[in-house]
Amino acid sequence: MSRRQRGVALLIVMLMLSLMVTIAASITERSGKAWQRTSNLLNRTQARWYALGAEALISNVLQRDAQASPESTFIGQPWSKVDHQMMADGTEIRAQALDGQACLNLNALSPARNVTPNNASGNNTSGNNNAANGSSGNGNSPQPPKVGTSEQVPYAAQVFRQLMIVLGEDPKQAERITDALRDWLDEDSEPLMNGAEDDSYVNFHPGNQRMTDVTELRAVMGMDAALYRRLLPYVCVLPVDKLAINVNTLMPGSAPLLSALFMGDISLDMAERILQQRPPQGWRNLNDFMGMSALPESGKNGARQVLVIKSDWFFADIQIRVDDSEFYQRSLFHRGKQIEVVQRQYGGYRTVNP
């Protein structure tokens, strides 16, 4: 074999070797990715079942609390405690229940028309119970009409506007955002005085229906990122259009919401002190709360429409860690005669917890 032929043969061998190495590397990479995908799928499936187990446990706790205290819901009951568990296989479970009525339900800003009012919390209580609580649970009684219109402003919308003002927003801008949000929720395409319908949005239309997630608030005309973040701890979305806020589960950090419920007639410091002075098992009825000397008479009529001492809507934030994988789930419970899970959300869904 000539020298030239030996060189060609060596070149062919090197080419074949490089091709074999490339193929082997590709097979190894694909096998590794397939193994990783399988591992992730198994971890996710395992985490999901753990989350459903945590959800069932929270459901049982809510049911027991309702049986132990059928007329009131307050901080200090078992449902309000964070549960942190380490399983035998190394899985870490963290679950926390949150009162869905310790926040302002955005869907209450545009209640359905010509509908007989019901208790917003979903309670099937009698008139006597409502009288004892001092509230019918309906947060949308007619209010004085807005200037220049015949539209009656729901009390929840007034609270939302006042909440933005308490958080430092300009009153005129707060009015515009409130009307824009009401237009987002209502079924028609007629804008309110300061509202926004189809013509105000580019490339998409307002929902014209109830919100299903609080993140929709970011898309409302006039809502910027800074205000959105400030509002997040105090607002939520429930699948009802009534407002009922439980004074027994408001934390001192919710002072801006309490101040807004009284239209700013109580300062943030005073609202925080009121919540700090709450009895260990909450106020026995709404009249005990309303009888506090620190509360201004001017705001009691409005606040009485929406304040309650019993909750029937709860969120559960569940975090599962399996090996290096993390799984997040938020469940929404409705507590009536039975505990029902009405919604589940997966993954990171917001930047601030309520």
Curated annotation (Swiss-Prot):
Residue ranges of the region described as Disordered: 114-151
Periplasmic side: 29-354
Annotated Gene Ontology cellular component terms: plasma membrane
Location of this chain's protein in the cell: Cell inner membrane
Propeptide section residues: 1-7
Keywords: Cell inner membrane, Cell membrane, Membrane, Protein transport, Transmembrane, Transmembrane helix, Transport
Ranges of biased composition (kind: Low complexity): 118-141
Pfam families found in the cross-reference section: T2SSK (PF03934), T2SSK_1st (PF21687)
Location (main, coarse): membrane
Oligomeric form and interacting partners: Type II secretion is composed of four main components: the outer membrane complex, the inner membrane complex, the cytoplasmic secretion ATPase and the periplasm-spanning pseudopilus. Interacts with core component OutG.
UniProt protein name: Type II secretion system protein K
Gene name of the record: outK
